[in-house]
Structure formats: structure tokens, C-alpha cells
């Protein structure tokens, strides 16, 4: 079993929650205030370490995931993300999907850190034209 921090549509009520269904929820948690949070094409969120600048604490859900299910979950993630280790606000560490360095270097993603989480961002912005609705399947955790 491994802790996995979800901060996108894999959370309860999200369109990709089925990928984690049945896995024990540890609880709602926040990252340490050391991360920037990005919207990738307004389709899914991405955490990235805030090196050399201010960071925010990002809200998500922590799950205790069996290793086989974690492997299966990784297969559903977008190519812009990779598995990384993050720090939580209480000093514990967890796996999470983070933005790849090469993606961050492009500078083409919207910084949504001030919203503090994906749900808050989605609630405040209409989906872009052609974007999937909240009940459409998506692989983003």
C-alpha cells in the first residue's frame, strides 16, 4: 500500500473517481505551501514544486492505494504528468502526479495556485469550448 494524493478529477465526485473506487480514503489533505498549481489545457490540474518562489498549499484527497492499483492508475494519467513525491502540510510525504519538468519549461500552462484546489478553480470558471463535461470520463487524478 502507498499513499497517493489526488488533486483533480480522481477525487470523490470527479469524473475519473472510478479509477480509485474502493480504495481507502485517508482524508482531505493539503500539500505543504511549496507548490504551484497549473491547469493544463483546462482539462486537468498539475502540481509543480515552487523552486525559488512562493508556493501555495493545495487541497486534495489522500488515499491508501494497493501497489497494483497504483500501477493501473498511472496508466490512465496524461503524458504531461509523472509520478512524484510531495510533502503534505503536516510534514508527511505522499506520491502524487506532478507536472513533468519539460512541460513546466514550456510556460504554457495557466497558474491556478491562488484557487487552492481544482474544485475551486472549476467552480469559478466555465469549461472551455469543446472541453468534456464533468460527467465525461477522464484519466486525470
Residue ranges of model-derived segments:
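Glycine-aromatic micro-motifs
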Residues: 1-130, 134-137, 141
Amino acid at each position: 500500500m502507498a499513499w497517493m494524493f489526488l488533486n483533480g478529477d480522481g477525487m470523490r465526485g470527479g469524473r475519473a473517481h472510478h479509477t480509485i473506487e474502493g480504495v481507502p480514503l485517508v482524508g482531505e489533505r493539503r500539500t505543504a505551501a511549496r507548490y504551484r498549481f497549473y491547469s493544463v489545457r483546462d482539462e486537468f490540474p498539475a502540481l509543480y514544486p515552487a523552486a525559488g518562489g512562493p508556493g501555495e498549499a493545495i487541497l486534495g484527497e489522500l488515499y491508501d492505494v494497493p501497489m497494483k492499483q497504483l500501477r493501473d492508475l498511472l496508466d490512465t494519467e496524461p503524458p504531461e504528468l509523472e509520478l512524484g513525491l510531495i510533502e503534505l502540510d503536516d510534514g508527511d510525504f505522499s506520491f502524487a502526479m506532478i507536472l513533468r519538468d519539460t512541460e513546466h519549461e514550456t510556460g504554457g500552462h495557466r497558474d491556478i495556485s491562488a484557487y487552492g484546489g481544482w474544485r475551486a478553480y472549476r467552480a469559478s470558471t466555465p469549461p472551455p469550448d469543446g472541453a468534456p463535461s464533468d460527467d465525461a470520463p477522464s484519466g486525470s487524478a
